Protein backbone atom coordinates (compact mmCIF):
# COMPACT_ATOMS: atom_id res chain seq x y z
CA UNK A 1 0.00 0.00 0.00
CA UNK A 2 1.22 3.47 -0.80
CA UNK A 3 2.06 6.09 1.81
CA UNK A 4 -0.87 8.52 1.73
CA UNK A 5 1.27 11.17 3.40
CA UNK A 6 3.72 11.00 0.47
CA UNK A 7 0.88 11.36 -2.05
CA UNK A 8 -0.40 14.33 -0.06
CA UNK A 9 3.04 15.97 -0.06
CA UNK A 10 3.90 15.27 -3.72
CA UNK A 11 0.61 14.94 -5.63
CA UNK A 12 1.94 15.80 -9.10
CA UNK A 13 4.88 13.43 -8.69
CA UNK A 14 2.50 10.69 -7.56
CA UNK A 15 0.24 11.29 -10.57
CA UNK A 16 3.19 11.10 -12.96
CA UNK A 17 4.46 7.88 -11.42
CA UNK A 18 1.08 6.20 -11.37
CA UNK A 19 0.20 7.35 -14.89
CA UNK A 20 2.92 4.90 -15.98
CA UNK A 21 0.80 2.22 -14.33
CA UNK A 22 -2.47 3.21 -16.04
CA UNK A 23 -3.85 5.14 -13.06
CA UNK A 24 -5.67 8.33 -14.06
CA UNK A 25 -4.83 11.58 -12.33
CA UNK A 26 -8.50 12.09 -11.52
CA UNK A 27 -8.32 9.08 -9.22
CA UNK A 28 -5.54 10.72 -7.22
CA UNK A 29 -7.49 13.99 -7.13
CA UNK A 30 -10.51 12.14 -5.77
CA UNK A 31 -8.37 10.40 -3.16
CA UNK A 32 -6.86 13.69 -1.99
CA UNK A 33 -10.25 15.44 -1.88
CA UNK A 34 -11.66 12.64 0.26
CA UNK A 35 -8.57 12.72 2.46
CA UNK A 36 -8.88 16.50 2.93
CA UNK A 37 -12.53 16.23 3.89
CA UNK A 38 -11.72 13.33 6.22
CA UNK A 39 -9.14 15.40 8.07
CA UNK A 40 -11.59 18.31 8.33
CA UNK A 41 -14.29 16.06 9.76
CA UNK A 42 -11.79 14.53 12.19
CA UNK A 43 -10.87 17.98 13.53
CA UNK A 44 -14.53 19.02 13.78
CA UNK A 45 -15.40 15.81 15.61
CA UNK A 46 -12.55 16.22 18.09
CA UNK A 47 -13.55 19.84 18.76
CA UNK A 48 -17.17 18.88 19.37
CA UNK A 49 -16.17 16.02 21.66
CA UNK A 50 -14.02 18.42 23.65
CA UNK A 51 -16.97 20.82 23.85
CA UNK A 52 -19.25 17.99 24.96
CA UNK A 53 -16.83 17.10 27.73
CA UNK A 54 -16.76 20.72 28.91
CA UNK A 55 -20.56 21.00 28.88
CA UNK A 56 -20.84 17.68 30.68
CA UNK A 57 -18.57 19.04 33.38
CA UNK A 58 -20.64 22.21 33.65
CA UNK A 59 -23.83 20.17 34.00
CA UNK A 60 -22.31 18.12 36.80
CA UNK A 61 -21.31 21.27 38.69
CA UNK A 62 -24.72 22.88 38.17
CA UNK A 63 -26.52 19.78 39.41
CA UNK A 64 -24.35 19.68 42.52
CA UNK A 65 -25.26 23.31 43.10
CA UNK A 66 -28.91 22.49 42.38
CA UNK A 67 -28.99 24.94 39.49
CA UNK A 68 -31.16 24.55 36.37
CA UNK A 69 -29.08 22.87 33.64
CA UNK A 70 -31.81 22.35 31.03
CA UNK A 71 -30.17 24.66 28.48
CA UNK A 72 -26.81 22.93 28.88
CA UNK A 73 -28.41 19.49 28.58
CA UNK A 74 -30.20 20.56 25.41
CA UNK A 75 -26.95 21.96 24.03
CA UNK A 76 -25.11 18.72 24.85
CA UNK A 77 -27.78 16.68 23.04
CA UNK A 78 -27.38 18.89 19.97
CA UNK A 79 -23.62 18.44 20.13
CA UNK A 80 -24.11 14.68 20.45
CA UNK A 81 -26.29 14.64 17.35
CA UNK A 82 -23.67 16.59 15.40
CA UNK A 83 -20.96 14.18 16.57
CA UNK A 84 -23.07 11.18 15.51
CA UNK A 85 -23.58 12.69 12.05
CA UNK A 86 -19.87 13.47 11.70
CA UNK A 87 -18.89 9.99 12.92
CA UNK A 88 -21.13 8.50 10.25
CA UNK A 89 -19.60 10.73 7.58
CA UNK A 90 -16.11 9.90 8.84
CA UNK A 91 -16.78 6.16 8.58
CA UNK A 92 -17.96 6.63 4.99
CA UNK A 93 -14.91 8.75 4.16
CA UNK A 94 -12.56 6.16 5.70
CA UNK A 95 -14.19 3.47 3.59
CA UNK A 96 -13.87 5.50 0.38
CA UNK A 97 -10.25 6.48 1.03
CA UNK A 98 -9.33 2.89 1.84
CA UNK A 99 -11.15 1.58 -1.24
CA UNK A 100 -9.04 3.75 -3.54
CA UNK A 101 -5.76 3.46 -1.65
CA UNK A 102 -5.63 -0.34 -1.45
CA UNK A 103 -6.20 -0.60 -5.21
CA UNK A 104 -3.34 1.70 -6.22
CA UNK A 105 -0.19 -0.16 -7.38
CA UNK A 106 3.32 0.56 -6.16
CA UNK A 107 5.26 3.52 -7.52
CA UNK A 108 7.67 2.35 -10.26
CA UNK A 109 11.37 2.89 -9.57
CA UNK A 110 13.15 5.65 -11.49
CA UNK A 111 15.19 3.26 -13.67
CA UNK A 112 12.16 1.27 -14.88
CA UNK A 113 10.99 1.85 -18.49
CA UNK A 114 7.97 4.11 -18.00
CA UNK A 115 5.47 2.64 -20.42
CA UNK A 116 2.02 1.10 -20.59
CA UNK A 117 3.29 -1.25 -23.30
CA UNK A 118 4.92 -4.52 -22.21
CA UNK A 119 6.94 -4.51 -25.44
CA UNK A 120 8.92 -1.60 -23.99
CA UNK A 121 10.48 -3.86 -21.37
CA UNK A 122 14.27 -3.56 -21.59
CA UNK A 123 16.66 -6.45 -22.19
CA UNK A 124 19.65 -6.13 -19.86
CA UNK A 125 21.85 -9.04 -20.98
CA UNK A 126 21.94 -12.63 -22.20
CA UNK A 127 23.72 -15.71 -20.92
CA UNK A 128 24.57 -19.02 -22.56
CA UNK A 129 24.64 -20.43 -26.06
CA UNK A 130 21.42 -21.55 -27.65
CA UNK A 131 21.58 -25.24 -28.59
CA UNK A 132 21.77 -26.19 -32.25
CA UNK A 133 20.06 -29.29 -33.62
CA UNK A 134 20.45 -31.28 -36.82
CA UNK A 135 16.72 -32.04 -36.57
CA UNK A 136 13.54 -30.05 -35.97
CA UNK A 137 13.37 -29.53 -32.18
CA UNK A 138 10.18 -30.83 -30.62
CA UNK A 139 7.96 -29.11 -28.08
CA UNK A 140 8.35 -30.31 -24.51
CA UNK A 141 4.80 -31.69 -24.40
CA UNK A 142 5.48 -33.87 -27.44
CA UNK A 143 8.76 -35.06 -25.95
CA UNK A 144 7.15 -35.81 -22.59
CA UNK A 145 4.20 -37.67 -24.07
CA UNK A 146 6.37 -39.79 -26.39
CA UNK A 147 8.68 -40.68 -23.51
CA UNK A 148 5.65 -41.53 -21.36
CA UNK A 149 6.66 -39.11 -18.60
CA UNK A 150 3.90 -36.49 -19.04
CA UNK A 151 0.22 -37.33 -19.39
CA UNK A 152 -2.02 -34.36 -20.14
CA UNK A 153 -4.91 -36.42 -21.52
CA UNK A 154 -5.61 -38.36 -18.33
CA UNK A 155 -5.10 -35.24 -16.22
CA UNK A 156 -7.78 -33.51 -18.32
CA UNK A 157 -10.09 -36.45 -17.69
CA UNK A 158 -9.56 -36.13 -13.94
CA UNK A 159 -9.34 -32.36 -13.44
CA UNK A 160 -9.86 -30.55 -16.76
CA UNK A 161 -7.46 -28.56 -18.90
CA UNK A 162 -4.17 -27.10 -17.64
CA UNK A 163 -3.31 -30.07 -15.41
CA UNK A 164 -0.75 -32.86 -15.87
CA UNK A 165 0.36 -36.20 -14.52
CA UNK A 166 4.14 -36.56 -14.11
CA UNK A 167 5.07 -40.24 -14.42
CA UNK A 168 8.16 -42.33 -13.74
CA UNK A 169 11.30 -40.51 -14.83
CA UNK A 170 9.22 -37.36 -15.31
CA UNK A 171 8.17 -37.37 -11.66
CA UNK A 172 11.73 -38.11 -10.60
CA UNK A 173 13.02 -35.25 -12.77
CA UNK A 174 10.53 -32.80 -11.24
CA UNK A 175 11.56 -33.92 -7.75
CA UNK A 176 15.25 -33.77 -8.63
CA UNK A 177 14.93 -30.23 -9.95
CA UNK A 178 13.21 -28.79 -6.90
CA UNK A 179 15.51 -30.60 -4.48
CA UNK A 180 18.48 -29.14 -6.37
CA UNK A 181 16.94 -25.67 -6.11
CA UNK A 182 16.31 -25.95 -2.37
CA UNK A 183 19.82 -27.25 -1.68
CA UNK A 184 21.38 -24.38 -3.64
CA UNK A 185 19.29 -21.79 -1.82
CA UNK A 186 20.23 -23.29 1.52
CA UNK A 187 23.90 -22.88 0.58
CA UNK A 188 23.20 -19.19 -0.09
CA UNK A 189 21.81 -18.67 3.40
CA UNK A 190 18.08 -19.07 2.85
CA UNK A 191 16.05 -20.74 5.58
CA UNK A 192 13.81 -23.44 4.15
CA UNK A 193 10.15 -23.20 5.12
CA UNK A 194 7.21 -25.54 4.58
CA UNK A 195 4.26 -23.13 4.88
CA UNK A 196 0.48 -23.54 4.84
CA UNK A 197 -0.97 -23.92 1.34
CA UNK A 198 -4.23 -22.27 2.43
CA UNK A 199 -4.27 -18.70 3.71
CA UNK A 200 -6.85 -16.26 5.05
CA UNK A 201 -8.01 -13.02 3.45
CA UNK A 202 -5.76 -10.87 5.64
CA UNK A 203 -2.74 -12.72 4.26
CA UNK A 204 -3.89 -12.28 0.67
CA UNK A 205 -4.40 -8.58 1.38
CA UNK A 206 -0.97 -8.26 2.99
CA UNK A 207 0.89 -9.37 -0.12
CA UNK A 208 -1.40 -7.46 -2.48
CA UNK A 209 -3.41 -10.22 -4.15
CA UNK A 210 -6.63 -9.05 -2.51
CA UNK A 211 -8.84 -7.20 -3.18
CA UNK A 212 -7.69 -6.56 -6.76
CA UNK A 213 -7.07 -10.13 -7.96
CA UNK A 214 -9.72 -12.25 -6.28
CA UNK A 215 -10.84 -13.64 -9.66
CA UNK A 216 -7.42 -15.22 -10.22
CA UNK A 217 -7.60 -17.48 -7.16
CA UNK A 218 -9.34 -20.55 -5.78
CA UNK A 219 -11.17 -20.10 -2.47
CA UNK A 220 -12.82 -22.59 -0.13
CA UNK A 221 -14.59 -22.11 3.20
CA UNK A 222 -13.61 -23.59 6.53
CA UNK A 223 -16.18 -23.21 9.33
CA UNK A 224 -17.64 -20.34 7.35
CA UNK A 225 -14.28 -18.55 6.97
CA UNK A 226 -12.80 -18.19 3.46
CA UNK A 227 -9.39 -19.71 2.79
CA UNK A 228 -7.51 -19.29 -0.47
CA UNK A 229 -5.20 -21.81 -2.14
CA UNK A 230 -1.91 -19.96 -2.43
CA UNK A 231 -1.00 -18.60 -5.89
CA UNK A 232 2.64 -18.47 -4.77
CA UNK A 233 4.65 -19.23 -1.62
CA UNK A 234 5.31 -15.49 -1.45
CA UNK A 235 1.96 -15.14 0.34
CA UNK A 236 2.60 -17.34 3.41
CA UNK A 237 6.30 -16.43 3.52
CA UNK A 238 5.78 -12.66 3.60
CA UNK A 239 2.86 -12.98 6.02
CA UNK A 240 5.04 -14.95 8.43
CA UNK A 241 5.92 -11.55 9.91
CA UNK A 242 2.51 -9.87 9.44
CA UNK A 243 1.73 -7.50 12.34
CA UNK A 244 5.19 -8.17 13.71
CA UNK A 245 8.38 -6.29 14.54
CA UNK A 246 11.54 -7.98 13.25
CA UNK A 247 14.73 -7.66 15.27
CA UNK A 248 16.93 -5.32 13.19
CA UNK A 249 19.96 -7.51 13.89
CA UNK A 250 18.28 -10.38 12.02
CA UNK A 251 17.90 -8.38 8.80
CA UNK A 252 18.13 -9.37 6.06
CA UNK A 253 15.91 -12.42 6.57
CA UNK A 254 15.92 -14.90 3.67
CA UNK A 255 13.24 -17.56 3.26
CA UNK A 256 12.79 -20.22 0.58
CA UNK A 257 9.96 -22.68 0.09
CA UNK A 258 8.75 -25.29 -2.34
CA UNK A 259 4.97 -25.21 -2.70
CA UNK A 260 2.34 -25.90 -5.29
CA UNK A 261 0.89 -22.73 -6.78
CA UNK A 262 -2.79 -22.57 -7.68
CA UNK A 263 -4.02 -20.10 -10.29
CA UNK A 264 -7.30 -19.85 -12.14
CA UNK A 265 -5.53 -18.17 -15.09
CA UNK A 266 -8.53 -15.91 -15.61
CA UNK A 267 -8.08 -13.99 -18.84
CA UNK A 268 -5.65 -16.54 -20.31
CA UNK A 269 -8.10 -18.30 -22.61
CA UNK A 270 -6.32 -19.44 -25.76
CA UNK A 271 -2.83 -18.77 -24.38
CA UNK A 272 -0.38 -21.64 -23.86
CA UNK A 273 -3.13 -24.22 -23.99
CA UNK A 274 -0.60 -27.05 -24.32
CA UNK A 275 2.32 -28.02 -22.14
CA UNK A 276 3.65 -26.95 -18.77
CA UNK A 277 3.91 -23.19 -19.26
CA UNK A 278 0.51 -22.08 -17.96
CA UNK A 279 -1.05 -24.47 -15.45
CA UNK A 280 -3.76 -24.26 -12.81
CA UNK A 281 -1.46 -26.14 -10.41
CA UNK A 282 2.34 -26.20 -10.56
CA UNK A 283 5.32 -26.49 -8.25
CA UNK A 284 7.48 -23.45 -7.64
CA UNK A 285 10.41 -22.70 -5.38
CA UNK A 286 10.13 -19.17 -4.03
CA UNK A 287 12.67 -16.83 -2.48
CA UNK A 288 11.57 -14.03 -0.13
CA UNK A 289 13.69 -11.38 1.55
CA UNK A 290 13.03 -8.88 4.35
CA UNK A 291 15.58 -6.09 4.68
CA UNK A 292 16.21 -2.49 5.70
CA UNK A 293 15.14 0.09 3.09
CA UNK A 294 18.71 1.15 2.32
CA UNK A 295 19.64 -2.43 1.43
CA UNK A 296 16.76 -3.42 -0.84
CA UNK A 297 18.32 -2.59 -4.23
CA UNK A 298 21.43 -4.58 -3.36
CA UNK A 299 19.19 -7.42 -2.20
CA UNK A 300 17.35 -7.33 -5.53
CA UNK A 301 20.66 -7.95 -7.30
CA UNK A 302 21.38 -10.81 -4.89
CA UNK A 303 17.95 -12.27 -5.64
CA UNK A 304 18.56 -12.10 -9.39
CA UNK A 305 21.99 -13.68 -8.93
CA UNK A 306 20.53 -16.57 -6.94
CA UNK A 307 17.98 -17.29 -9.68
CA UNK A 308 20.58 -16.92 -12.45
CA UNK A 309 22.96 -19.25 -10.67
CA UNK A 310 20.45 -22.09 -10.98
CA UNK A 311 20.00 -21.57 -14.72
CA UNK A 312 23.73 -21.35 -15.27
CA UNK A 313 24.41 -24.56 -13.36
CA UNK A 314 21.67 -26.24 -15.41
CA UNK A 315 23.27 -24.91 -18.60
CA UNK A 316 20.03 -23.29 -19.76
CA UNK A 317 20.40 -20.14 -21.90
CA UNK A 318 18.41 -17.14 -20.72
CA UNK A 319 18.19 -13.39 -20.75
CA UNK A 320 17.30 -10.83 -18.09
CA UNK A 321 14.83 -8.04 -18.76
CA UNK A 322 13.54 -5.10 -16.75
CA UNK A 323 9.78 -5.00 -17.08
CA UNK A 324 8.06 -1.85 -18.26
CA UNK A 325 6.24 -0.02 -15.49
CA UNK A 326 2.76 -1.30 -16.29
CA UNK A 327 3.93 -4.89 -16.84
CA UNK A 328 5.40 -5.26 -13.35
CA UNK A 329 3.35 -6.88 -10.62
CA UNK A 330 0.89 -4.79 -8.60
CA UNK A 331 3.18 -4.68 -5.55
CA UNK A 332 6.50 -4.22 -7.32
CA UNK A 333 8.58 -1.06 -7.68
CA UNK A 334 10.88 -2.91 -10.07
CA UNK A 335 10.73 -6.38 -11.58
CA UNK A 336 13.47 -8.21 -13.43
CA UNK A 337 12.30 -11.26 -15.33
CA UNK A 338 14.59 -14.15 -16.19
CA UNK A 339 13.38 -15.79 -19.38
CA UNK A 340 14.74 -19.17 -20.44
CA UNK A 341 15.26 -20.18 -24.06
CA UNK A 342 12.69 -22.62 -25.47
CA UNK A 343 14.05 -23.99 -28.79
CA UNK A 344 10.79 -25.39 -30.17
CA UNK A 345 9.02 -22.09 -29.55
CA UNK A 346 12.04 -20.16 -30.82
CA UNK A 347 11.63 -17.64 -28.01
CA UNK A 348 12.43 -16.89 -24.40
CA UNK A 349 9.79 -17.68 -21.76
CA UNK A 350 9.57 -16.37 -18.21
CA UNK A 351 10.97 -18.71 -15.59
CA UNK A 352 11.56 -16.26 -12.74
CA UNK A 353 10.32 -12.82 -11.71
CA UNK A 354 12.48 -11.01 -9.15
CA UNK A 355 10.81 -7.98 -7.57
CA UNK A 356 11.61 -5.27 -5.07
CA UNK A 357 8.30 -4.36 -3.43
CA UNK A 358 9.94 -1.64 -1.28
CA UNK A 359 7.65 -0.92 1.70
CA UNK A 360 4.43 -1.60 -0.23
CA UNK A 361 3.68 -5.04 1.21
CA UNK A 362 5.14 -4.22 4.61
CA UNK A 363 2.76 -1.27 4.94
CA UNK A 364 -0.24 -3.48 4.09
CA UNK A 365 0.92 -6.29 6.37
CA UNK A 366 2.38 -4.02 9.09
CA UNK A 367 5.86 -5.58 9.07
CA UNK A 368 8.34 -3.32 10.84
CA UNK A 369 11.70 -3.06 12.58
CA UNK A 370 13.30 -0.51 14.92
CA UNK A 371 15.99 1.71 13.42
CA UNK A 372 19.11 2.89 15.27
CA UNK A 373 17.05 5.60 16.99
CA UNK A 374 14.47 3.10 18.17
CA UNK A 375 11.86 4.38 15.75
CA UNK A 376 9.59 1.88 14.03
CA UNK A 377 10.12 1.67 10.27
CA UNK A 378 8.63 -0.53 7.58
CA UNK A 379 10.94 -3.20 6.18
CA UNK A 380 11.34 -3.68 2.45
CA UNK A 381 10.23 -7.03 1.01
CA UNK A 382 11.51 -8.78 -2.09
CA UNK A 383 10.42 -11.96 -3.81
CA UNK A 384 11.59 -14.08 -6.70
CA UNK A 385 10.97 -17.47 -8.26
CA UNK A 386 13.87 -19.76 -7.73
CA UNK A 387 12.58 -21.29 -9.99
CA UNK A 388 9.24 -22.30 -11.48
CA UNK A 389 9.76 -26.07 -11.48
CA UNK A 390 7.45 -27.12 -14.32
CA UNK A 391 8.88 -24.50 -16.66
CA UNK A 392 12.37 -25.66 -15.73
CA UNK A 393 11.43 -29.24 -16.62
CA UNK A 394 9.96 -27.97 -19.90
CA UNK A 395 13.16 -26.10 -20.75
CA UNK A 396 15.33 -29.12 -19.89
CA UNK A 397 13.24 -31.34 -22.16
CA UNK A 398 13.56 -28.89 -25.06
CA UNK A 399 17.18 -27.81 -24.65
CA UNK A 400 18.55 -31.28 -23.87
CA UNK A 401 16.50 -33.30 -26.37
CA UNK A 402 18.39 -35.75 -28.59
CA UNK A 403 17.78 -36.92 -32.14
CA UNK A 404 16.65 -40.37 -30.96
CA UNK A 405 13.90 -38.82 -28.81
CA UNK A 406 15.74 -39.20 -25.52
CA UNK A 407 16.62 -36.33 -23.20
CA UNK A 408 20.02 -35.83 -21.61
CA UNK A 409 19.88 -34.95 -17.92
CA UNK A 410 21.92 -31.86 -16.90
CA UNK A 411 25.06 -32.87 -15.02
CA UNK A 412 24.07 -31.11 -11.77
CA UNK A 413 20.80 -33.04 -11.69
CA UNK A 414 22.33 -36.50 -12.26
CA UNK A 415 23.13 -37.07 -8.53
CA UNK A 416 19.49 -36.26 -7.73
CA UNK A 417 18.40 -38.88 -10.30
CA UNK A 418 20.37 -41.74 -8.71
CA UNK A 419 23.03 -41.43 -11.40
CA UNK A 420 20.64 -41.55 -14.36
CA UNK A 421 22.13 -39.51 -17.22
CA UNK A 422 19.31 -39.63 -19.77
CA UNK A 423 15.59 -40.27 -20.05
CA UNK A 424 14.65 -42.78 -22.72
CA UNK A 425 11.44 -44.44 -23.81
CA UNK A 426 12.26 -47.40 -21.59
CA UNK A 427 12.32 -45.23 -18.46
Curated annotation (Swiss-Prot):
It is found in: Cytoplasm. Keywords: Aminoacyl-tRNA synthetase, ATP-binding, Cytoplasm, Ligase, Nucleotide-binding, Protein biosynthesis. ATP binds at residues 263-265, 350-353. L-serine binds at residues 232-234, 286, 385. GO terms for molecular function: ATP binding; catalytic activity, acting on a protein; serine-tRNA ligase activity; transferase activity. Pathway: Aminoacyl-tRNA biosynthesis; selenocysteinyl-tRNA(Sec) biosynthesis; L-seryl-tRNA(Sec) from L-serine and tRNA(Sec): step 1/1. GO terms for cellular component: cytoplasm. HAMAP family: Ser_tRNA_synth_type1. Belongs to the class-II aminoacyl-tRNA synthetase family. Type-1 seryl-tRNA synthetase subfamily. This is Serine--tRNA ligase. It comes from Lacticaseibacillus paracasei (strain ATCC 334 / BCRC 17002 / CCUG 31169 / CIP 107868 / KCTC 3260 / NRRL B-441).
Amino acid sequence: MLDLKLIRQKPEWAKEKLAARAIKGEEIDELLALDTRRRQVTVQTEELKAKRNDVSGQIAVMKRNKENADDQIKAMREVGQKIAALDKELAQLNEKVTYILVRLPNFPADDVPMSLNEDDSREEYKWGNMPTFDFEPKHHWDIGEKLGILDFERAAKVAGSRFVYYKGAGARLERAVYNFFLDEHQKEGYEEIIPPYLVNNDSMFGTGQFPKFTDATYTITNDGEPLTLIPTAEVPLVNYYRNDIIDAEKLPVNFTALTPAFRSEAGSAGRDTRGLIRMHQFNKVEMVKFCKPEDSWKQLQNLIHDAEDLLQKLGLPYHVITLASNDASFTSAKTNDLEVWMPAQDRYREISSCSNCTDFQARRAQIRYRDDDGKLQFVHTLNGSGLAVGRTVASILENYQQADGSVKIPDVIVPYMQGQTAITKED
